[in-house]
A protein has these predicted regions:
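Leucine-biased recognition of intrinsically disordered, low-complexity hydrophobic segments
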Residues: 3-5, 12, 22
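Short hydrophobic alpha-helical segments enriched in small aliphatic residues
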Residues: 7-9, 17, 30-32
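Structured-RNA-binding interfaces characteristic of tRNA pseudouridine synthases
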Residues: 34-329
Length: 329
């Protein structure tokens, strides 16, 4: 009897303290009863992070036991910072070696730190975990923002943009080995552009899904844009630092191209769409490279799409040239 009386008195106290605030909240969100229930009783903030990372030092995004992944790395830092277990909902499960400019991930927690300061605090902790006074973290939070309680980073996304980088040069650079796909054959970028036109629109992209992928309800996707960009003067083209004297002895002209007989080119393939199959961008890239190298005609792209057969498409480009550039909402 005493226990029931105590519970009753406590309930009345909570009601009289919270009721005015709840009524104000209800007036603004009458059309979202689920939101009221979740936000009011959990009292958590829903935080969306924009993340960039160097994928060459991780075993992909998704957490794995006994392996260092981006998701696991960040969850450890956030759980320690917020004194509670944090589970991130990422938009893209990038593979080992794949990088990101704009990965998005959300989580809910009772965050006391001002949201506008959260990215700075997390980045300071990430940096402190690295060895050496000048060591930089391979992961950085670009932005942190609060979203409505019913927001989900993955399920609410409207599309993504990927960039694939190719170093088209006779000789490769050791400094680029983890960040671009080196292709020594000169690529016909005009042919690649003609082929890319067939990708735009809504198609069944079964031919561009990795063999053995988990069966899914549909392999139909919409590609908003597919663009080939060429940069002849990229900062990624490393030149020799040898002296002019040693260069003259080789018979080359000072100031000339010291690495190859033709100008290095950095080619970027930009692909945006409402969703992507497993390895889809890498297989599209491999097919475009085969077309640029003259192994396939540009018109073959249309037949490859229609075939819905992985064996008809080109090779799978390596992961280290791929970047998750942006997630659309």
């Amino acid at each position: 009897m005493r226990l029931r009386l105590c519970i009753y008195i406590y309930s009345l106290a909570v009601f009289y303290v919270k009721a005015p605030q709840l009524e104000n909240y209800r007036a603004k969100h009458e059309h979202k009863p689920d939101t009221i229930r979740k936000e009011w009783y959990e009292m958590d903030k829903n935080i969306l992070l924009t993340i960039e990372y160097d994928g060459s030092v991780f075993h992909g995004w998704q957490r794995q036991p006994d392996r260092e992944t981006i998701q696991g790395h960040l969850e450890t830092v956030l759980s320690s910072l917020l004194h509670t277990e944090i589970l991130l909902n990422g938009t893209s499960r990038t593979d080992a070696g794949v990088h990101a400019y704009g990965q998005r991930a959300s989580f809910t927690a009772d965050v006391k730190i001002p949201v506008e300061k959260l990215a700075l605090v997390i980045n300071n902790i990430l940096r402190s975990r690295e060895k050496g006074s000048f060591a930089a973290s391979p992961v950085r939070i670009v932005k942190a923002e609060e979203k409505p309680a019913d927001f989900h980073a993955r399920f609410d996304s409207k599309g993504k943009k990927y960039i694939y980088r190719i170093h088209n040069a006779e000789k490769s650079s050791v400094f680029l080995r983890n960040y671009v796909y080196h292709v020594p054959e000169k690529l016909d970028t005009d042919a690649m552009r003609r082929a890319a036109e067939y990708l735009r629109g809504t198609h069944d992209f079964k031919s561009f899904e990795a063999s053995g992928s988990t069966p899914r309800q549909t392999t139909v996707r919409t590609i908003y844009d597919a663009e080939i960009i060429v940069n002849e003067e990229s900062a990624c083209s490393f030149k020799s630092m040898e002296s002019e004297d040693s260069f003259k002895s080789s018979g080359a002209e000072p100031g000339g191209d010291r690495t190859s007989h033709r100008a290095d080119r950095n080619i970027e393939i930009h692909v945006s769409g409402d969703g992507f199959l497993y390895n889809m961008v890498r297989i599209i890239t491999g097919t475009l490279v085969d077309i640029g190298a003259g192994k396939l005609a540009p018109e073959e792209m249309k037949r490859i799409i229609e075939a819905r057969d992985r064996t008809k498409a080109g090779h799978t480009a390596p992961p280290y040239g791929l970047y998750l550039a942006e997630v659309y909402y």
